[in-house]
C-alpha cells in the first residue's frame, strides 16, 4: 500500500504544470475569468484554485468546492493541498517553484508564485489584485511537491 501511495504522489508531481498555472495567473490577475464564480473582497483562494486547475491539479477528495469546482475558502484550499500530496514549510524550500501556491498571515491569504528570485518570490493574487508583485519572506507558508 505504501508503494502505491508513493506512485500516486509521484504521478501528481509529474502531472502538474507550474508554467501553465503561471500563464493563467498572469492572464487573469488583473481581471476575473467569467467562467468562474467571483468573490469580491475574498477571492484569493478561488483565484489560486483556478491557477492550480490550469496547471492540471485535481481537486479530487476535496471538500468546500463551489458550483464551478473551485475552493473559495483558504482553509479548504490548504486542506486540499495537504490531502493531495503537497508538503508545506515556513522557510522557502529548494523544491518550491513558480506555479506553486503559498499563504501569508497564518493562512489568511493565498497567492501563486509567478517567479522565484534568490531572495524573494514574485506572485499573483486576487482580493487586492496583484500581478507579479514581490512578497516579503516572513510569515509565509510554502506548499510544494
Could you tell me what each predicted segment is?
Residues 64-129:
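...with weaker cross-activation on analogous glycine-rich loops/strands in unrelated enzymes
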